[in-house]
């Protein structure tokens, strides 16, 4: 491997802080369960062996504020319409009459309400994920529309990718009662996996801004974009500074690789 998977350590001259104390100090007093946040983030830093600096703690809080306004299960405006549109889109893609799907959704779900009723009143991604889990697991139509893939891809207070969480469970300090997906929607799980994605990889960035960009675009996207910029200057070839050095949808070389080949002659 080109890099170790060790998290960044304390820089020279940096002083370790009491993570829980910094969380209590920096979070707005209006936030519910500040103590639960403080304990979850402190345990996250300890179990992932992250450098306990004010900058790192504040970086986690900044992402949580940006993504959820410090809510473990944030409400998403218009989520019910989004959910219905996704179901109708899948039905049309599979050439299943929409009215048949809507009829199937009128049956009673495991919580006693119909799937339609739950979808009409859904407010959060956690609720929507649970509806799809039930629908896929209980109703043949659900398997036909979605296979085994729940279409809710992110969750929790930091809106971390569920696929990312499923690939990075080593060292998780709490006992999981359910699935990794369900754990992401908990306060502790959302913070643990979100912090892992934000901080738990070595990157010699000068400012936290680049880690924030990586959080949205993928690990090392900022570094890769800087490399692309250097290639542009060296070759004069225009490239999208998107951080994607290779094509993931094809064996064909991407634009960045083709530009680098020009440098090599």
Model region roles, listed by residue range:
Residues 2-265:
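Cell-wall glycan-active module
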């Amino acid at each position: 491997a080109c890099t170790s998977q060790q998290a960044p350590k304390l820089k020279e001259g940096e002083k370790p802080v009491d993570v829980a104390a910094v969380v209590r100090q920096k979070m707005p007093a209006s936030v519910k369960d500040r103590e639960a946040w403080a304990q979850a983030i402190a345990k996250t830093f300890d179990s992932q062996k992250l450098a306990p600096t004010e900058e790192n703690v504040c970086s986690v809080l900044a992402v949580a504020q940006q993504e959820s306004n410090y809510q473990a299960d944030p409400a998403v405006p218009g989520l019910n319409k989004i959910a219905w549109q996704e179901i109708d889109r899948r039905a049309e893609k599979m050439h299943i009459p929409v009215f048949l799907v809507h009829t199937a959704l009128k049956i009673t779900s495991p919580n006693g309400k119909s799937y339609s009723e739950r979808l009409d009143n859904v407010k959060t991604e956690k609720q929507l994920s649970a509806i799809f889990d039930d629908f896929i697991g209980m109703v043949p139509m659900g398997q036909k529309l979605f296979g085994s893939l729940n279409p809710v891809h992110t969750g929790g207070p930091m809106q971390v990718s569920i696929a990312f969480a499923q690939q990075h469970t080593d060292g998780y300090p709490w006992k999981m009662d359910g699935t990794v997906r369900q754990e992401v929607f908990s306060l502790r799980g959302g913070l643990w996996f979100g912090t892992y994605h934000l901080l738990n990889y070595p990157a010699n960035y000068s400012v936290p801004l680049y880690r924030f960009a990586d959080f949205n675009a993928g690990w090392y996207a900022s570094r890769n974009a800087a490399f692309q910029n250097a290639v542009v200057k060296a070759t004069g070839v225009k490239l999208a500074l998107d951080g994607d050095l290779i094509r993931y949808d094809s064996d064909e070389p991407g634009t960045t690789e083709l530009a680098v080949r020009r440098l090599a002659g």
